Each structure stands twice: as C-alpha cells, then as structure tokens.
Regions:
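A composition/biophysics-driven feature that prefers long, compositionally simple stretches
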Residues: 1-170
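Hydrophobic pocket-lining residues that define ligand/cofactor binding sites across diverse proteins
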Residues: 21, 179, 196
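Short catalytic-site patches enriched in acidic/histidine residues
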Residues: 37-48, 133, 142-148, 152, ...
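Short, structured loop/turn "capping" segments at alpha-beta junctions
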Residues: 168-172, 202-203
C-alpha cells in the first residue's frame, strides 16, 4: 500500500470521526468528498467524478462502494479492506447497491450523515440517493464533519506541510532565474515543476498561476502562454 501516514495516524483520525459521530448522534456517515476519503483511509483517486461513497458506521466498519476501475486504486493506496463494486452500465443505479450495504450494516431506520457538499455527488446522483433513502432512514447534511477535524494538523501532517513550503520556496527561487525578456512562460512553469518533482513533491492541488502582459492580473490559470518582454 502507498500510505503516506502511519497506522497510528489513521487510527487516531478514525477515532476522532467516530467520537464526532457519537456526539452528533449519527449511526453512519456516507462520505462523498474525496478529501475525506483520503484523510481517513489514504484512498487516492480522481474517480470521485463518478458515483462512489465510503461508508463508516458507528461500530467502525468501513466499506467503499466504487466502480471497477478504482478497485486496484483503492487496494494499492488505502487501508480499506471491504471494497464493493457497482457495475457502470446503461440503466444502473449505484444507490441500489448502496442500499444492500446499508441493510448489511442494519442501518434501516437509523440516522445517516451525508456529505452533500461534494464535487463527486452530482445533482442527478443526489436525487437518486434521496429517493433511495426516502422512508428508509433519516438523513442529515454532515458535509463539514470531517472537514472540521482536518483543520487541526497532526505532527505527521505538519512535516508534509513544511516540506511542501520548502519546495514552493525553491520553485519560486527558480522563477527568478528565467524571468527575463524572451523567455516563454511555459519554460518557467517547466522549471518550477522540475524542482517540485525532483524534490520529492507531486502535482499541486491547483496549477501554478502564471501571467504576463495582458494576463498579468488574472487570478486563475489559463492556457495562453506568453513570451516575456522587457516591460513584464
């Protein structure tokens, strides 16, 4: 497994979630936020653009419902032992597969917390989910339950934060070597990313934002790469 944190770190995180669920009288939490799944189990994927959910009940049972392409992704990057697959084909409804799991966990008539505010839970899938759970259990929006726990960083997390800051500084230092008239922005970006990857880093959560000339004041990344002139 490609876990980046210790078993003890993950144990503590899970314990905090279970304590929070108990305080909020939640029998189970349905996670749709990829960042929640990663924080709790190490599960690393961009497959969240399709329907998938990580179920955690108050007994500590953890079950991932996802598509076949993410089976090995979950096996290789997370500590999740129970991985269920829903078949992605015309007419399939993954909330039916979810109900089977909820039945196994005896959650009918219970109170479920759901991460409704999640990029992975589209409006269409939300309608399916709500219809499936109607008259089955009670639900509450618990989108921020794990998010609030993630705010306070552990010692292991702070090590990564400091390393990321060091790499960011090194990448910025590299910029000044190439910020000259006649140099294309693509070259600058390439050198910045080279520093990050050679330093043991990874893709940033947000692309590096670079701009000169008419794009100098843009606040978002865009694909129009300029060649710097003497006035930039």
């Amino acid at each position: 497994m490609g876990l980046h944190f210790s078993k003890e770190e993950f144990r503590v995180r899970k314990s905090k979630v279970l304590d929070s669920m108990k305080d909020q009288n939640i029998d189970a939490l349905l996670m749709f936020r990829q960042e929640s799944m990663y924080w709790l189990t190490g599960y690393d994927t961009f497959g969240y653009v399709f329907f998938q959910t990580l179920i955690l009940d108050k007994k500590g049972n953890t079950i991932l419902l996802t598509r076949a392409p993410d089976l090995r992704q979950a096996q290789n990057t997370s500590n999740i032992k129970d991985i269920r697959i829903w078949v992605d084909k015309d007419g399939s409804n993954p909330t039916d597969d979810l109900k089977v799991i909820l039945d196994e966990l005896n959650l009918k008539g219970k109170k479920l917390g759901i991460e409704y505010e999640a990029y992975g839970l589209t409006g269409k899938n939300t309608l399916k989910l709500n219809k499936s759970l109607e008259n089955y259990c009670s639900v509450e929006d618990k989108s921020d339950l794990i998010t609030k726990l993630r705010v306070v960083k552990s010692k292991e997390e702070i090590v990564y934060v400091k390393k990321a800051a060091e790499l960011a500084d090194q990448a910025l230092d590299e910029v000044w070597k190439y910020a000259k008239a006649g140099v294309n922005e693509s070259k600058i970006l390439a050198e910045m990313n080279k520093v990050i990857f050679e330093g043991g880093g990874d893709y940033p959560a947000n692309e590096f934002i670079i701009g000169s000339g008419k794009n100098a004041l843009l606040c978002r990344y865009q694909s129009d790469k300029q060649t710097l002139n003497a006035q930039d």
